[in-house]
A protein has these predicted regions:
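Structured helix-beta-strand junction loops
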Residues: 62, 83-84, 128, 157
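A mature extracytoplasmic/lumenal domain signature
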Residues: 70-73, 91-95, 124-126, 136-138
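Histidine-centered active-site/metal-ligand motif
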Residues: 118
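Structural recognition of the beta-strand scaffold that forms the well-ordered cores
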Residues: 67-68, 86-91, 121, 132-135, ...
Length: 174
């Protein structure tokens, strides 16, 4: 978001993301489609992550020009990056498909989740080298990852992607 002229910190976003319990009293788990599951910081309790819907909703609190690409093929995501728009995506910590999914009962029904869920911002790519560059919240800027593996993980994780275009002259946020 900072890239697009939106003055907001990661901490502020973390404080404002919708959250749901990791586990309810009845044994059901939170649904990442409804909010960040558990503790965002991980300091007070377990946390899993969040899917595109709550991220889109959060971004709309700060900018008018937010777009949800969820369901789009990976080429569409790459095209947006080529147009100059970094794209937030859901992937895995391996940046490749994983096999450690488990089924959770949630208030909305059963969903399959993985503790390998991860999100990054795609910042660039090199078609000749077949690599994608991502800003990884684990401390890596423009981290190089394999294109085909990343595209397969993107598909496995539900083709979830959100991007923001240059900030309009919006004067109030949140």
């Amino acid at each position: 978001m900072n890239y697009n002229g939106i003055d907001v910190t990661k901490s502020e976003l973390a404080d404002n993301i919708e959250t749901v319990p990791f586990q309810y009293d009845n044994g059901e788990h939170g649904n990442p489609n409804d909010g960040f599951v558990g503790s965002v910081s991980g300091s007070t309790s377990a946390g899993l992550g969040v899917y595109h819907g709550p991220i889109y909703k959060l971004a709309k609190q700060y900018a008018d020009n937010v777009y949800d690409l969820t369901g789009s093929n990976f080429d569409t995501v790459v095209n947006k990056v080529e147009e100059g728009h970094p794209v937030w995506t859901i992937t895995t910590t391996a940046f490749a498909p994983v096999s450690d999914f488990e089924s959770w009962d949630t208030p909305d029904g059963k969903i399959d989740v993985t503790y390998s869920e991860h999100s990054v911002c795609i910042t660039g790519f090199d078609r000749d080298k077949r690599v994608i560059y991502v800003n990884d919240p684990y401390g890596y800027k423009n981290r190089e990852v394999d294109w085909n593996d990343f595209a397969a993980a993107y598909k496995q994780m539900g083709k979830q992607a959100v991007y923001v275009t240059k900030c309009s002259n919006r004067t109030s946020y949140a």
